[in-house]
């Protein structure tokens, strides 16, 4: 849950085995401030090396930006089961980075994120990029993976607790984005 009356720093993560997007925002009252975003890109190598790159990259980002909470896009079931499993492993590396720093992790579906940020759960990537740019008063559209991560953080900042909130103590919470 978001504490009321104080600012909070949120790291949003859009997990991917090849490209993991990240975005950091701060919420102070109803004000959202952009702090940074980008992508952790893995080399074409074995799965363990790619997962380590994701874990190490997000660990650096957490140390640099000091978020208090983490919002992660939930894995959707793909037509290709192998792709779904690989994406789940990338997501696991991302969650592990947060848990190593004793941060609570909140999950949101793509539908929840798009509904919260764009007002349409079936919005196109370009619409998400445009709304993220406007909500955070950016000079240009962020890259798609970074925009998705920022949108996830914005969804959480808007008061969502996600389908599952995984705290360090494995305490489950339920809720959703407004």
Curated annotation (Swiss-Prot):
This is Crossover junction endodeoxyribonuclease RuvC. The keyword DNA repair applies. The active site is at residues 14, 73, 145. Binds 2 Mg(2+) ion per subunit. It is an enzyme of class 3 (hydrolase). Transmembrane segments: none annotated. It comes from Nitrosomonas eutropha (strain DSM 101675 / C91 / Nm57). GO terms for biological process: DNA recombination; DNA repair. Belongs to the RuvC family.
């Amino acid at each position: 849950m978001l504490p009321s009356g104080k600012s909070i720093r949120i790291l949003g993560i859009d997990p991917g085995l090849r490209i993991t997007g990240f975005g950091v925002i701060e919420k102070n009252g109803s004000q959202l401030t952009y702090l940074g975003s980008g992508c952790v890109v893995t080399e074409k190598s074995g799965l363990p090396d790619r997962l380590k790159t994701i874990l190490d990259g997000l660990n650096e980002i957490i140390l640099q930006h000091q978020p208090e909470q983490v919002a992660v896009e939930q894995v959707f079931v793909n037509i290709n089961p192998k792709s779904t499993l690989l994406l789940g492993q990338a997501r696991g590396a991302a969650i592990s980075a947060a848990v190593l720093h004793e941060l609570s992790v909140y999950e949101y579906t793509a539908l929840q994120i798009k509904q919260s940020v764009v007002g349409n759960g079936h919005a196109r990537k370009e619409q998400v990029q445009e709304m993220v740019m406007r909500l955070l008063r950016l000079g240009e559209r962020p890259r798609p993976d970074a925009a998705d991560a920022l949108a996830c953080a914005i969804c959480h900042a808007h008061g969502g607790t996600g389908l599952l909130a995984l705290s360090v103590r494995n305490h489950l919470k339920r809720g959703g984005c407004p």
